[in-house]
Structure formats: structure tokens, C-alpha cells
């Protein structure tokens, strides 16, 4: 039978391996999945703890284990599943007998609710699959990446195949899970309940294909997802949008979105955050910040920096207004009393926010001082089932990246560097996540860091996380890195990727994308965690609030659009009666688009050919940027090209001119151009100043 070696070269990257294969005894080949199933689903290998691998799912899943010899951080931190507020959502969702999606901003408890629902279904004997489109969130609740679950390649560049190709790939993978893969992973056909997180990062085409394939495979063509119970969560404020993004084509604008998720719930409470700050965060999301709100936000954030005594007093006052010292945690942070965490915050200088472009340069050091360590499985570990081996190895490699656990891939820390802790340590460690410290000493296997706010100097070892499949526990991929974040690399995109970035000075001129203001403020606990300036310059720019998300959230929450009699439709640039706005919006985004170049409405079916006319091309002869619709006229009148190809051009060799005339190569045939991005053109002063002349 064919034997397949497990090697780590497919993950792409350089590894520092600490595994010495020569010193380890050679163990036999891995067990077959069918062999384990014959022994019984509850029988576990003797050298693993029973609670670690015990499962009621009926199929294999990825196990992510933290080595106790390193930093004992909990990257999952879903500690509030049994709270009364969480269980109320669980009871309502299970009693609805419908597919449910929970929407909300960061730290509103979405992931905790999903995990609690999944465990409640497992307690009832259901087969539950945990799936997420985000690698960090998939690791936190012990699930799969969606691409591995449905059998697609991990799409780094949004390379979406056609609908027919998607349907075929999903059906083929479901059949492989039942036959070739021997039930080592769940599939759309084998599970009873699907816990689906980060729907906002999913392409609408993939969701539509999942629905169609489930209807065929499960034999229920009239039911959404073929009768599969789906509990989903999404943060549509985190859509990858920018000010010039389209107003249509989003996943919540699918024609059958209401059929796929009949019950849509909006979570508005940001846990662990003061109520006054939460009010301003929601106003920032919906674009409702007034001049008084902006003044209050800037004044209260800077008040704790001017007077250290006022900071402590204000922190205690706000602590009584928080959502509770221990509550549902969506970002995984441990909720402790605000007065304890903010006691010494006024003594620490805030770190200035840098732009995303500057952060990329600082974040990608060519020769980092603390590179990540990746321990690969020994080469003599082999799988007798080639198909299973290829699939599982690929899944483990892509699920064991540093980004999947919220760790920094390459650190470049030296003595005196400012850092903050990414995860909570154990009780004896005495330092909570987000605490800012200074590196005092750099060792080979530990960093000595002093945390002045808690008056502690501790040795921070590397955090060791291993990933393996319970059917093949001998094959493990391990990553090691210090659970620290360099403070000089704090930028908007890094604040949204790596958690617990507090004590930051937010300059709104460094914010770049839509909803950046609300997304960053949602990560703060109190006004003492940040200072902010130039809010007015960012909040009133066109496109800084994502209009489709705002309308969708107000609709499912039954919020009034406004008190005005008419509403402005951003898609067709017209005023619509408030009572008919939702009906108009649904039809408008499916029928027309607005062309900003022509300032006119374009039917949606003609949008592609119309946009092609506005494509900018660069004339390689005269160096001018020309619209494609005007290219034909330009190529006949380009002065530089006419001078070059003209038979009277004395700078061209005579033989060249004769050949050009004999072969009929005139100026039009030799004229060349290349594609050109409109964003590369020089901007006017009005655009650079944000609308001010």
C-alpha cells in the first residue's frame, strides 16, 4: 500500500525546528481511522488525558493544546458560557426551531453564545460541527476553518471559482468524508447542527452553494440548508470595505437571506465597557456623532492624562457603570474590575498610533531577533492512507499558524522595548492581558519584562501550542512564540488583529478604512485606556460609515431611520419617503448602481461594460494617462508617437523606416499602452484635505 511522508514544506515559510528525529525511538505507523472506530469512539490512547480527547461529536476534530512547560496562556478564554445572560440566548435560540444569526460589534458575546449553543446541542446527543471563516476565532472555540470543512483551498487572494465548480467541489468533499476520509472530519451531510462563526468574511457565492448542496445531499430541497440547523454569528462592521466600496453584493443582501436565517438578532451590549463609552461607540458606528459627542469623547479621554488623581477617581466612578466585572467575553479577555486595571494607567504614557503603511515596514523585519519556532513532526511518521494524510496534513499546517492564535510571527525586541501582554497568565503570574511593560533582559528562552502598573518583573517564556488530530495523535505541528506585542507597531489594522492594545493615543488622521473609528473604540474598556484627537476630521468624511450595514442593522433591530420625512438613498442618489425606504432599498441595490465618473445611474447588468470604458491606460509613448473610451482618438493624434514613426524622423535608421512602410506598420500599430489604476493619478488639493478647499 502507498505510504505518504508527512513533511512541513507545504506551509510556506522557514522553520526553526527543535525536533531531533535521531534521538527519538521509531514508532509504528499511525492507526487507521476505521481501526479506531472499531475500538469504540470513547476509547482513547493511554498516553493522552481522557478529558482532552473525549468528544460527543462522533467524528474527529482538531485539538489545539497549550504546553504547560511554556507560557500558560488561554487563547480561547470562553469562560462565561454558563452565565444567565448567555443561557437566555441559548434557550431562545434552541426554542425557536429556526436558523438563527447573531449580529453585533466586537465584544458583544457572539462567540461565547455560539459555543454555549453547541455544547447544549451536544448534550442532547446531536452531532455538532464548529466552523469559522476567521482562523483566530476557529482556534478559540475549537473548530475548523470553513475552507477545510467544505473542501475548498484556503483562498488567500479571494479566488472564488464559478458556481458550478463550487457545487461540484462541495458535493465531492461530502462524499469523501463519508468514504475515503472514514469520518475523520464532519461534513455538510453528516452533522446535525452547524455552529457557523464569522459569516461576514464569507463570499455570498459560497453560502449560496452551501445551501444548494445541502438541499440535494440531505434530501430536503424545500428547506433552508436541507433541514440542517445553523446557528451563525457575524460582525458586519468588520466587512473589508473602504469609502468607495459598492453599496450592493453583500452576503446579507442575498435574495433568500431571510429564508436562510429567519431569526436575526442584533447584540448591542459591549461587555466590560463603560456605558457612557458604549453609547459613543454605537453613535460612531451609525454616523450619529454630534459636535457635543465629539467634544465629550476627546475631553473625557484626555482628562485622565492631565491629572493622575482624577484618572483614578474617574475610573472608580465608571466601574460602577460597567456591564459587570465578569460577563460574556467575545474577544476572549478576562473581565476584571475596572478600578483594578485602571488604577495605575494614568502613570503610563500613551503609545501613538501609526499608519498601516508604516506598520507593515516595522512589522516585517528581514532578520527578527525573536522569530517564531515551528516544530514539525518527525519524518518517519507516515500515514498508510495517502488521501487522508494529504487532507489532514494540509488542514493542520494551515490551522497552526501564529496568526491563528493571535501571536506575532516575528518579534524584534531589544532591551528597553515597550511591549504589552497578549494573553492572561495563571493566577501566580500576576499580570493580566493588555498590561504594558518594558523589556529589561533578553534571554534565549525567556524575556525579562518589568510591568510598572502592577509593580512586577517577570520572566515571560515562549507560548507553545500544538495542533493534532485525535485519530492520529502522533502527528503534531507545534508553534512557539513569546506572547508579547511590540508597542511601536500599533496601527489601526494591527489593533483589529491583535487584542488588548490599550494606553494608545488615537490620531484619527491615521485611520484609513470605513468603520475604523467604531471598531477601534469598541476594543477600549474605559476612557482611561486611550486618548483621541481629530475625531471631527474623520467622522464627517464621506463613506466613513458603511451604509448597507447601517441600514441592515437598523432594520433587524426595528430602529427608526430618522425623524425626517425623506431619506437619502446612497445607491441611486435620490430622496425616498421614509415609510417606503426599505422597500426601495431592496429593489435599488439589485437593479442600479451610481457611476461617480458620469454622475448618472447605470443598470446593474450594464455596469461591467460601462466601468470598462472608464479604465485608465497609460500611453507609453507620451506618458499621458488616458481613459479607455478615449484611447482610439488618442492613438491617432499622439504627437510623440507620430514623431517617432514618421518616415521623416531622421533619428530612426533608414532601413527601419523602409521596413515599417513595406510591412504597413504605421503609428497606430506600433502605439502601446498598459493598464493604469485611477488611484495612482495625482489627487487635487480638495481630495487630499478631506473636502476642504
UniProtKB/Swiss-Prot annotation:
SUPFAM superfamilies to which the protein is assigned, alphabetical: P-loop containing nucleoside triphosphate hydrolases (SSF52540)
Biological process (GO) annotations?
DNA recombination; DNA repair; mitochondrial genome maintenance
Q: Where is the transit peptide?
A: 1-67
- Function, as annotated: Required for the maintenance of mitochondrial (kinetoplast) genome stability. Probably has no helicase activity, missing at least two of seven conserved helicase motifs.
User: What Gene3D superfamilies has UniProt attached to this entry?
Assistant: P-loop containing nucleotide triphosphate hydrolases
Q: Name the predominant localization.
A: mitochondrion
Q: Where is the composition biased (Polar residues)?
A: 321-330
Q: What is this protein called?
A: ATP-dependent DNA helicase-like PIF8
The organism named in the record is Trypanosoma brucei brucei (strain 927/4 GUTat10.1)
Cellular location(s)? Mitochondrion matrix, Kinetoplast
Q: Where is this region: Disordered?
A: 300-348
For this protein's source organism, the top of the classification is: Eukaryota, Discoba, Euglenozoa, Kinetoplastea, Metakinetoplastina
What keywords are assigned to this protein? DNA damage, DNA recombination, DNA repair, Kinetoplast, Mitochondrion, Transit peptide
Listed under GO cellular component are: kinetoplast; mitochondrion
Mitochondrion keyword on record = yes
User: Assembly and interactions?
Assistant: Monomer.
The family line of this record is:
Belongs to the helicase family. PIF1 subfamily.
* Knockout mutant characteristics: Essential, it cannot be deleted.
Amino acid at each position: 500500500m502507498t505510504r505518504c511522508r508527512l513533511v512541513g514544506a507545504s506551509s510556506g515559510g522557514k522553520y526553526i525546528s527543535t525536533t531531533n528525529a535521531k534521538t527519538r525511538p521509531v514508532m509504528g505507523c499511525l492507526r487507521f481511522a476505521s481501526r479506531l472506530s472499531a475500538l469504540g469512539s470513547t476509547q482513547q490512547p493511554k498516553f493522552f488525558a481522557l478529558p482532552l480527547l473525549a468528544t460527543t461529536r462522533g467524528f474527529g476534530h482538531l485539538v489545539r493544546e497549550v504546553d504547560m512547560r511554556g507560557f500558560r496562556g488561554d487563547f480561547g478564554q470562553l469562560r462565561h458560557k454558563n452565565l444567565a445572560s448567555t443561557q437566555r440566548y441559548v434557550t431562545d435560540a434552541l426554542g425557536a426551531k429556526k436558523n438563527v444569526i447573531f449580529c453585533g460589534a466586537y465584544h458583544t458575546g457572539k462567540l461565547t453564545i455560539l459555543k454555549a449553543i453547541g455544547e447544549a446541542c451536544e448534550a442532547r446527543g446531536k452531532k455538532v460541527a464548529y466552523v469559522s471563516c476567521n482562523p483566530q476565532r476557529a482556534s478559540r472555540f475549537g473548530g475548523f476553518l470553513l475552507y477545510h470543512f467544505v473542501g475548498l483551498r484556503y483562498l488567500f487572494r479571494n479566488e472564488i471559482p464559478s458556481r458550478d465548480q463550487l457545487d461540484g467541489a462541495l458535493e465531492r468533499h461530502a462524499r469523501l468524508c463519508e468514504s475515503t476520509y472514514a469520518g475523520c472530519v464532519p461534513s455538510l451531510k453528516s452533522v446535525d447542527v452547524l455552529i457557523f462563526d464569522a459569516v461576514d468574511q464569507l463570499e455570498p457565492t459560497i453560502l449560496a452553494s452551501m445551501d444548494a448542496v445541502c438541499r440535494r445531499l440531505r434530501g430536503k430541497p424545500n428547506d433552508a440548508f436541507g433541514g440542517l440547523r445553523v446557528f451563525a454569528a457575524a460582525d458586519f462592521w468588520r466587512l473589508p470595505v473602504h469609502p468607495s466600496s459598492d453599496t450592493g453584493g453583500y452576503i446579507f443582501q442575498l435574495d433568500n437571506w431571510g429564508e436562510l436565517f429567519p431569526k436575526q438578532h442584533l447584540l448591542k451590549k459591549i461587555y466590560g465597557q463603560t456605558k457612557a463609552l458604549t453609547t459613543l461607540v454605537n453613535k460612531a458606528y451609525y454616523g450619529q456623532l454630534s459636535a457635543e459627542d465629539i467634544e465629550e469623547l476627546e475631553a473625557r479621554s484626555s482628562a485622565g492624562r492631565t491629572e493622575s488623581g482624577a484618572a483614578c477617581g474617574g475610573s472608580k466612578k465608571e466601574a460602577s457603570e460597567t456591564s459587570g466585572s465578569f460577563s460574556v467575553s467575545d474577544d476572549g479577555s478576562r473581565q476584571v474590575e475596572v478600578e483594578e486595571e485602571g488604577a495605575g494607567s494614568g502613570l503610563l504614557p500613551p503609545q501613538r498610533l501609526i499608519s498601516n503603511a508604516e506598520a507593515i515596514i516595522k512589522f516585517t523585519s528581514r532578520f527578527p531577533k525573536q522569530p517564531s519556532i515551528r516544530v514539525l513532526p518527525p519524518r518517519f511518521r507516515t500515514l498508510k492512507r495517502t488521501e487522508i494524510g494529504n487532507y489532514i496534513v494540509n488542514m493542520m499546517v494551515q490551522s497552526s499558524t501564529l496568526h491563528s492564535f493571535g501571536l506575532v510571527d516575528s518579534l524584534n525586541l531589544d532591551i528597553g522595548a515597550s511591549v504589552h501582554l497578549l494573553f492572561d497568565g495563571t493566577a501566580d503570574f500576576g499580570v493580566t492581558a493588555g498590561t504594558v511593560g518594558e523589556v529589561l533582559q533578553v534571554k534565549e528562552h525567556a524575556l525579562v519584562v518589568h510591568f510598572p502598573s502592577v509593580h512586577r518583573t517577570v520572566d515571560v517564556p515562549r507560548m507553545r501550542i500544538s495542533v493534532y488530530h485525535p485519530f492520529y495523535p502522533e502527528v503534531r505541528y507545534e508553534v512557539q512564540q513569546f506572547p508579547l506585542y511590540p508597542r511601536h507597531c500599533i496601527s489601526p489594522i494591527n489593533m483589529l488583529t491583535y487584542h488588548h492594545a490599550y494606553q494608545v493615543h488615537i490620531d484619527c488622521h491615521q485611520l484609513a478604512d470605513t468603520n475604523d473609528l467604531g471598531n477601534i473604540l469598541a476594543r477600549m474598556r474605559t476612557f482611561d485606556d486611550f486618548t483621541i484627537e481629530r475625531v471631527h476630521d474623520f467622522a464627517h468624511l464621506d463613506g466613513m460609515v458603511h451604509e448597507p450595514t447601517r441600514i441592515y442593522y437598523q432594520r433587524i433591530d426595528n430602529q427608526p431611520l430618522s425623524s425626517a420625512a425623506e431619506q437619502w438613498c446612497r445607491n441611486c442618489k435620490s430622496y425616498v419617503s421614509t415609510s417606503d425606504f426599505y422597500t426601495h432599498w431592496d429593489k435599488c441595490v439589485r437593479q442600479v448602481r451610481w457611476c461617480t465618473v458620469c454622475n448618472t445611474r447605470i443598470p446593474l447588468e450594464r455596469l461591467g461594460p460601462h466601468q470598462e470604458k472608464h479604465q485608465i491606460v497609460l500611453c507609453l509613448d507620451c506618458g499621458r494617462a488616458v481613459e479607455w473610451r478615449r484611447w482610439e482618438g488618442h492613438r491617432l493624434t499622439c504627437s510623440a508617437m507620430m514623431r517617432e514613426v514618421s518616415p521623416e524622423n531622421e533619428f530612426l535608421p533608414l532601413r527601419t523606416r523602409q521596413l515599417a512602410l513595406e510591412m504597413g506598420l504605421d503609428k497606430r500599430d506600433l502605439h502601446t499602452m498598459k493598464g493604469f489604476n485611477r488611484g495612482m493619478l495625482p489627487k487635487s488639493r480638495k481630495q487630499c484635505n478631506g473636502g476642504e478647499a
